Regions:
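N-terminal pre-Walker A segment at the start of P-loop NTPase domains
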Residues: 59-73
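Glycine-rich phosphate-binding loop and adjoining beta1-alpha1-beta2 segment
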Residues: 115-151
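Glycine- and acidic
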Residues: 83-84, 92, 123-127, 255-262
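Phosphate/oxyanion-binding active-site loops and adjacent basic polyanion-contact surfaces
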Residues: 91, 130-138, 219, 266, ...
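A structured beta-alpha segment of the ubiquitous adenosine-cofactor-binding alpha/beta core
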Residues: 141-176, 181-185
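Glycine-rich phosphate/adenylate-binding loop
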Residues: 1-56, 169-176, 180-294
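Glycine-rich adenosine-cofactor-binding loop
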Residues: 74-117
Length: 294
């Protein structure tokens, strides 16, 4: 079972079997929600129903975090990612997939920032589903990653509209800023904030029709910034200039617009972005070489 409401201990749980509704009285820890902040309290419960009859003696409370860690054993460093915080700047198709993958890897906390709301057209590629249509993308993705038993906070705001001190304070509190917005102004705003705060930044975006994409890792003091990297890419890319134009971006790079593309192509790009994110977050792990300036 998954308890969505209440705080602290849940005293009454209800379910429906073939024989009709029943109620199991017990104490099961659940998550608690405070405004836009979602905090998991560390346990899930399972109630076995055999032949339509509730078997109350089969209620089991497990340490879900430890159970999930068993599938990540030896793939990450001993400390894992529980004490890491990631800012997801952009909760669209690409950002939602990267966030989900990082939560499955064990990242302990997310700060999700996006001003848009999920619509039906997004469902062909977004990690969220029809139940989230009409909701804030930030809140929907915050709850999506929370279902992997991590803490999350949603902020419904235009990143470009934030003043420098507010954005700097936000990024200074995280270990990695993952920017997947398709607004050049937003990307460069985040890039500048990363340089001011010394926070590592990962910038990912798809090209037109998701024919390809780019992942740029910025490590202040150890790598070029986004502005420098974008300036060099024309010299090293084998993709034609017209195909390399970022998705959702008009020729003047100001107006955002809908762009065709398959979720499968974005999944490939999000997997690459996630690998680089893990290299930064787990510097002694098996992917650490990806983040090496050498």
């Amino acid at each position: 079972g998954y308890v969505r409401e209440g705080e602290g201990l849940v005293q009454a749980l209800s379910a429906t079997a073939a024989s009709g509704p029943f109620r199991e009285i017990g104490a099961v820890r659940c998550r608690k929600t405070k405004g836009n902040r979602i905090v998991p309290l560390g346990a899930m419960f399972f109630l076995e129903i055999a032949a339509g009859v509730p078997m109350t003696k089969s209620v089991e409370v497990i340490n879900a975090s430890e159970a999930m860690d068993a599938r990540r054993k030896d793939l990450l460093s001993d400390r894992g990612l529980k004490d890491k915080t990631v800012a997801l700047l952009g909760a669209g198709s690409l950002g939602s997939k990267v966030g989900l993958l990082l939560s499955e890897a064990g990242v302990g906390r997310f700060l999700v920032v996006d001003r848009d709301h999920l619509d039906v057209a997004n469902l062909s590629r977004h990690a969220c589903d029809v139940a989230d249509v009409g909701r804030s993308k930030a809140m929907a993705v915050a709850e999506l990653v929370q279902r992997r038993l991590v803490a999350s906070e949603a902020i419904d705001v235009d990143i470009v509209a934030l003043d420098d001190p507010t954005l700097d304070a936000m990024l200074a509190s995280v270990d990695l800023a993952v920017s997947t917005t398709d607004s050049p102004a937003c990307q460069f705003t985040v890039n500048e904030a990363c340089l001011r705060t010394g926070t590592a930044g990962l910038f990912a975006g798809a090209y037109e029709r998701a024919c390809g994409g780019e992942v740029v890792l910025v490590q202040p003091g150890n790598s070029p910034c986004l502005f420098c990297a974008v300036g060099f890419r024309a010299d090293i890319s084998e993709v034609a200039p017209e195909e390399r134009r970022k998705a959702y971006q008009s020729a003047d790079a100001q107006q955002l617009m809908a762009e065709p593309g398959l979720g499968a192509d974005l999944a490939y790009l999000s997997a690459i972005a996630t690998a680089y994110a893990l290299a930064v977050l787990d510097p002694t792990g098996m992917r650490a070489a990806l983040a090496s300036p050498e």
